[in-house]
Amino acid sequence: MEEQHQEAGNESKPSSTSVDLQGDSPLQVEISDAVSERDKVKFTVQTKSGLPHFAQSEFSVVRQHEEFIWLHDTYVENEEYAGLIIPPAPPRPDFEASREKLQKLGEGNSSITREEFSKMKQELEAEYLAIFKKTVAMHEVFLQRLAAHPTLRRDHNFSVFLEYSQDLSVREKNRKEVLGGLLRSIVRSADEVLITGISGLKEVDDFFEHERTFLVEYHTRIRDTCQRADRVMHSHKCLADNYIPISAALSSLGTQEVNQLKRSFLKLAELFERLRKLEGRVASDEDLKLSDMLRYYMRDSQAAKDLLYRRLRALADYENANKALDKARTRNREVRPAESRQQLCCQRFERLSDSAKQELMDFKSRRVSSFRKNLIELAELELKHAKASTLLLQNTLVALKGEP
């Protein structure tokens, strides 16, 4: 397998995570080209803009994965966007598993025939290409979500990411920073339990109480569904891989058999080879249309949960500010600072509540449209493959019965 791989911009990129994100947006973003160099992928990001804060109407830059993560982190850390669902960061490109499989295949090629080796090598190269295309698509969806959002697309760092032609000098997070992020996640989870459990804070809006209950359960269920969908997809892929040796064995046996059986064995060998290709397509389609979609919305639902936590934290701060103001008035000391603090907390809580309600409704609409589109397409593809498999078996049966 080549260590460098390039995807042309006019090739179709798989997209299972969304329906038409860009529409009539004044900011159109796409990844027109990508090059893989061992562990790094360089994405060519092309932008067409009708927004006044860009210097040009069309421009392109080359970005790496770490720069996408930097952009995501700047949104998460910006208080201005606390009331918004921040689109999930794209996953890190990971081609190591495919490379290891190919290396093991090369090391153990003495135990298999040249034909088996060639077919298995083609399968692994196709797997590598599929991972590469999905990597490009996930990075593109992240940018398109930002570009389609009326608030997020006006962010200064987003403009820099899209327009600044030089390298952003963003390095990969070190071990300490990764552990720090994990620690913050643990602290946040503990804080949420403390707010809702020990302190006994009561939700003041039924809409958000319902959304929080729903998202906690939904996130768990979509994670479990994703794991099971992955197992089904891998089963189809394993079946496809297992057709290779049986096809080769039948073909080899056919060359040794008497003429009355030779054609039958060769016909069966051809059947298993064509079934292998069909099973491979089934696995690929289930991975793209189901597993990838579930995996994306597992991350997106986590982003929605993060939004609800920020609002809940704002509610707790507002309640604490009210208590502090009551104490200040009782003691008749530092009343004005307590009033200012209470007003700021109130304003922040109301601002987050207003934007969060719209964001959660948009999340529902986006999720329904995406699932409906992909599940319909998956069912159509499953039917198409089932018909092809049935026709293949029927033709093989006719051929076998017609032999003397």
Curated annotation (Swiss-Prot):
Keywords: Coiled coil, Protein transport, Transport. Belongs to the sorting nexin family. GO terms for molecular function: phosphatidylinositol binding. Residues 21-168 form the PX domain. Disulfide bonds: none annotated. Residues 1-29 are annotated as: Disordered. GO terms for biological process: protein transport. It comes from the Eukaryota. Residues 11-20 have a biased composition (Polar residues). Residues 255-336 form a coiled coil. This is Sorting nexin-32. The keyword Transport applies. The keyword tRNA-binding does not apply. May be involved in several stages of intracellular trafficking. Residues 1-10 have a biased composition (Basic and acidic residues).
